[in-house]
Amino acid sequence: MTASRDIACRVRGFGAYTPVDVLTNFDLEKFVETTDEWITTRTGIRQRHRLAEGQNASDAATEAARLALADAGMEPGEITHVINATCTPDYLCPNTACLVEAKLGIMGAMAFDFNAACSGYVYGLSMARAIVAAQPEARVLLTATEALTRRLNWADRTTCVLFGDGAGASVITAEGEGALLEDVLCASDGNLGGLLTIGGGTHTPYAKGDPVGEDFFVQMNGRDVFKHAVRNMAAISQDVLARNGLTIDDVALVIPHQANLRIIEAVGDRLGVPAERVFVNLHEFGNTSAASVPLAIADARAKGVLRPGMRVLLATFGGGFTWGAALLHF
């Protein structure tokens, strides 16, 4: 487990982007063997957004980044680092962060991708904080973007109904206005990697003309993912609270990874937090993986649910297996 603590760090701007195209459960009924009732009762999801043809993960990240920069009152040229969380990059090389950097007109920044799946944003906060600790003058743009609908097997109703496309972004600096990043914890267990996979890497390479196999798409052992997700999200949330001398009563709002309503409810039960203090928007966006948490933060602010003065607990889990938690004081 890695931790970042006692390092002054401000999350100054937030932005989120979701594509215009909306795919409802009723739309899915037309070409997937499923129903709105089946999806809603098992997941809580009613719709998800889908990138248009020719639109990629870097495009979504760029739009979210522009909004985050505007929210922070900063110009792209002030950014020194671009770090991007994704498991659905535009290419294996160049990295998506470099593409975002170019689209924003940034020159000379350090830019790289990383993959912590659905835990990406919280992992990114940990990395951004470490960068700021080493270089107090750093101004870090953190993006989290996914184009998951490009990697779904539409014949597998257990996975294709879950995911959507979108992006979120934040600007992190040592000083200035914005939410105080009080603490962040991240952990993983590679022994659980087989529970949630997306193929197409060197383990499952594809040559031109090869038929696309099922292992190219999202594959998931839903039952085991549920069990480990609930256990680890709750445990690391309790850990980050305890190490800061806090209890769940000191948290005004919990923003969990928006994967499945049953998972969110089970984590809330374990933490002993009432449902009205847990932010949920997966019915609108589905599971957007790394983009889920920053998208939820931006949405909660826009809806007036997240207000200045509130302490927020972020809790995530994802393929790898990865998980993390962070405390933000707005």
From Swiss-Prot:
Keyword Ion transport applies: no
Chain residue ranges for the region called ACP-binding: 258-262
Associated pathway: Lipid metabolism; fatty acid biosynthesis
GO molecular-function term, one example from the UniProt record: beta-ketoacyl-acyl-carrier-protein synthase III activity
Active-site residues per Swiss-Prot or TrEMBL entry: 118, 257, 287
Subunit structure and binding partners: Homodimer.
Family, per entry: Belongs to the thiolase-like superfamily. FabH family.
Function of the molecule: Catalyzes the condensation reaction of fatty acid synthesis by the addition to an acyl acceptor of two carbons from malonyl-ACP. Catalyzes the first condensation reaction which initiates fatty acid synthesis and may therefore play a role in governing the total rate of fatty acid production. Possesses both acetoacetyl-ACP synthase and acetyl transacylase activities. Its substrate specificity determines the biosynthesis of branched-chain and/or straight-chain of fatty acids.
Protein name as catalogued: Beta-ketoacyl-[acyl-carrier-protein] synthase III
UniProt source species: Nitratidesulfovibrio vulgaris (strain DSM 19637 / Miyazaki F) (Desulfovibrio vulgaris)
Origin organism lineage: Bacteria, Pseudomonadati, Thermodesulfobacteriota, Desulfovibrionia, Desulfovibrionales
